[in-house]
Amino acid sequence: IVRDIDAARDHVHLLFYIWLPDGNGCKIAEALKRAAVRGVTCRVMADALGSRVLIASAHWKAMVDAGVHVAVALPIGIPLLRPLSGRLDLRNHRKIVVIDDRITYCGSQNCADPEFRVKPRYAPWVDAVVRFEGPIARQNQHLFAADWMAHVDDDIAEILRRPLPPAGPGLI
């Protein structure tokens, strides 16, 4: 993912349920900062609960300072008042990366080191992430755009109207 972010020319969109300020999480944040500084539009969204440690960290602020557009999915607000305004357990569990509308990653892997365990009694488990290239990236672009525009006053629908990049050789 870092290599693809470093090669991005137009935009990078990321959405993670859990994004931690650990080794892998910081590598992604650093790559996003580099991309934003060189003029790539970077939009990232992280779940308010699953990514709360990163969101409250200096890494999040450093991304903003570098020009990365950030959004928090499903803000919690004041936890004691949350039952009055909605369910705390409804979270955005997506893990999506879209780069230049031609590369996408998706799967069950959060943005965290492999050793990360939320609940040790359930671990170890195996997460997977798959890299796709070509027109299929547009599907994840739609998912990201829907979540982004639901939380941010930033209409990115124009990206969805662009011609699709040509498909390359694929595996059948």
Residue ranges and their predicted role:
Residues 1-172:
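Charged, low-complexity intrinsically disordered terminal segments
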